Amino acid sequence: MKIEELIAIRRDLHRIPELGFQEFKTQQYLLNVLEQYPQDRIEIEKWRTGLFVKVNGTAPEKMLAYRADIDALSIEEQTGLPFASEHHGNMHACGHDLHMTIALGIIDHFVHHPVKHDLLFLFQPAEEGPGGAEPMLESDVLKKWQPDFITALHIAPELPVGTIATKSGLLFANTSELVIDLEGKGGHAAYPHLAEDMVVAASTLVTQLQTIISRNTDPLDSAVITVGTITGGSAQNIIAETAHLEGTIRTLSEESMKQVKERIEDVVKGIEIGFRCKGKVTYPSVYHQVYNTSGLTEEFMSFVAEHQLATVIEAKEAMTGEDFGYMLKKYPGFMFWLGADSEHGLHHAKLNPDENAIETAVHVMTGYFSVYAN
């Protein structure tokens, strides 16, 4: 498949962004592309709104897997591109449209240039939430198609096209969604002494949560608590009875995650006492760290560099969350960053990756699989 064809596919996918486990149009689009290939070369299995696609090897003794996430974000696109989102309020602001396109490019290559071993492609829904990797790993499909190895990539807007970045060991952080609900006694704004103000309680809570990082976390460790949204109150002259906070926790170790959560519970108990209210803490979605398999990762980096498939950079750990970590917990493999050179970063309404990154990724992965799947 030529790069022009892949870019056209990417733009089609960019127009139809869908949220986690709602990727019905996306799934059908992928099927329309894949069903053009000879069915003796590929096998397709639907899984919820995702897909498993096996490219049959000539004399398979093992199976190498590649994962591409397919969901979008609840963001109103502001790129002004002629192929901008047609689903208002949703946007491919994390590059998953490129991820899918790259996977299709790799599949196309190996349908026409078979290798010895089987290749399995996982088009995974709901990476952004509520988390598609764990349930996908439990599917019946993976009971008959068991990978020996798995890999994935993620675009990096801050890196130039033609580069990849990765490292052995920890690449992405442990992440957890955080939801806190406060409930007190509302009242008239003229009589604050007769009420318990949950907006003030929530404001105090936000500042106290940050002391967990500055005063309870080892300075040589890394942890981040972000409160992204606060809602509370119904009118300007009514003291709020409830407040709702949502955010994330990110750490570089599971022990730090445990400690941070314990301290959050303590801080919320203090708010309950101080503001005579009730607090409830929940963690709706938790993502395991992405930990690249030693040996395989270095081998991949050396291969790409030696064959000049891309410029290879030694990555640093990132506080990014990725449910691909669950797949690496079950199978050996690695993940890497793909340079995509965009002025605006991931999850930004103006993210506009350089589409030439698609060709780089297809070149890297077809070169790698051509050797390691033979």
Curated annotation (Swiss-Prot):
Q: Which UniProt keywords apply?
A: Amino-acid biosynthesis, Diaminopimelate biosynthesis, Hydrolase, Lysine biosynthesis
The protein's name is N-acetyldiaminopimelate deacetylase
UniProt cross-references to InterPro entries, sorted A to Z: AcetylDAP_deacetylase, Amidohydrolase, Bact_exopeptidase_dim_dom, Peptidase_M20, Peptidase_M20_dimer
User: Which HAMAP family does its entry note?
Assistant: DapEL
Report if keyword Amino-acid biosynthesis is assigned: yes
**Its biological purpose:** Catalyzes the conversion of N-acetyl-diaminopimelate to diaminopimelate and acetate.
PANTHER family documented for this protein:
N-ACETYLDIAMINOPIMELATE DEACETYLASE, PEPTIDASE M20 FAMILY MEMBER
GO MF annotation, one: N-acetyldiaminopimelate deacetylase activity
Q: Which organism is it from?
A: Bacillus subtilis (strain 168)
Keyword Cell inner membrane among UniProt keywords:
no
Pfam families linked to this entry? M20_dimer, Peptidase_M20
Q: Which GO terms describe its biological process?
A: diaminopimelate biosynthetic process; lysine biosynthetic process via diaminopimelate
Q: Catalytic residues per the record?
A: D69, E128
UniProt family annotation: Belongs to the peptidase M20A family. N-acetyldiaminopimelate deacetylase subfamily.
Q: Which reaction does it catalyse?
A: N-acetyl-(2S,6S)-2,6-diaminopimelate + H2O = (2S,6S)-2,6-diaminopimelate + acetate
**Pathway noted in the entry:** Amino-acid biosynthesis; L-lysine biosynthesis via DAP pathway; LL-2,6-diaminopimelate from (S)-tetrahydrodipicolinate (acetylase route): step 3/3
The EC designation for this entry is: 3.5.1.47
